[in-house]
Amino acid sequence: GLDCPTGRALAAGPLKLTTDAEARTPSGTLSLTDINERTLKSLDVKFGLGTFTAITGVSGSGKSTLLYTLANSLRERVKTSVDDGDVASKSKGPAEKTGSARATTVELSADLNSDIAINRLVQISQKPIGRTPRSCLATYTGLFDRVRKLFAQTDEAKRRGWTVSRFSYNVTQGRCPTCSGEGQIEVELVFLPGSYTPCPDCHGARYNSETLEVTWNGRTIADVLELTVAEAREVFADEEAIARALRALSAVGLDYLRLGQPATELSGGEAQRIKLATELQRAQRGHTVYLMDEPTTGLHPADVDLLMTELQRLVNNGNTVVVVEHDMRVAAQADRVLEMGPGAGARGGQVVADGSPATVAQTDTATGRVLAERSSS
């Protein structure tokens, strides 16, 4: 076979399934009792803290509803809830619309040690990181604040009396007046959604010409926004805070994105991985529950492996990860597979298989059959 990512993926051997013996032992239990949401009827489900759970099942079987219900129930009980909806639309998930979510009770089991109380809930969805070009990779991850500091510390910036705000494309002094720092101009089209075209004055640089007279190591701040993550890792190798953020982006397979890539040009999967990387660079030990809906959508198998490495690292640090997933490469590596079904809609909403991937592979269910088939060569 060809030695390239796709060639290696096609030639990859059978999936290795986590066995009962290999699965992590939960450090505590999270119980959801009597869930009545959409297709879920009087359902009781337990999740193991400090483990990796993959919720699988056919489309419409209730996977996402279960995840939303877990999120809503936890949200009322944790100190910090990071729901990425704050930057995107305020539209509510299915479980939040129905109103009966309040009936769902979450009990932290008695064997939950006080030192692993959950104090953070992080929901990572595929909502955009912003709706206009004003939000970009560098601003969302926070690394741009540190880059601006470097520019403000240059002799030339000090000589001119400029502070970090001069190097923000959201501030009048530094930004291009024509596009107001967006680097693009929205074109209104009759009967069609508007689209963006590069600014005729700054040509996408976002800044006015005076701001671009200041350089750091021979680069303007607009040059920095043009760097890809991979290029920026070399440029900022000695700046630990920036390098750490870049390493996290690289770890989820985003080496190819430009630092200034506008939110409007990012796919849902890319947005989700940017959020994950932003979390990874500040991941504390334990105490956090991460919920993700289809994190591998649109990913190449090589990127799925990168993502799995990072998710496993979160769990190794004592955190809890629950994902809804169609990708069997993810399910195979989970500690536990929770399969919803047996069908969709009214014919779904039940747990039809539950156990380590190796155990589920022995059941005659949709996920079980695929795991069995993919794990035997």
Protein language model features and the residues they cover:
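Conserved phosphate-binding elements of NTP-dependent enzyme cores
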Residues: 1-377
